[in-house]
Amino acid sequence: MEQTQTIIKGGAFLVEDVDINRVITPEDFTDEQKMIANTTSEYVQNEVLPVVENLEHHEFEHSVRLLKTAGELGLLAADVPEKYEGLGLDKISSALIAEKMSVAGGFSITHGAHVGIGSLPIVLFGNEAQRSHYLPK
């Protein structure tokens, strides 16, 4: 018999009775999740924030450089399976990257567009030829 679970949406865990084992808190993060969060925070602090004003003034050559650096760190490949040279991380790690990237001003949109509009549809819906062509680094 197939079991179904109710999805906890938004802040529902605050106002509804929820099994505590279904709520994830920072104390539950694995060492790998903490590491990717720290890597992203350091990247944003050291690479993005120093040029955020330049980006806001449409000096987009910085965006290209920053995306290349993010790619070298694996920050563009969290949801890409290892088979295609990605990190194949879990959704919590992917969410942590997005959270830490959110302080990066407009660059967080550049990053989000690349991973959310660019790569993720290919991961989820692309055929083998498309994945092999577009997903490798």
What spans do the regions from the language model cover?
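Intrinsic disorder at enzyme termini
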Residues: M1-E32
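A ubiquitous short alpha-helical element
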Residues: Q5-I7, E32-N38, S102-A104
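Glycine-rich flavin
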Residues: E42, L49-K137
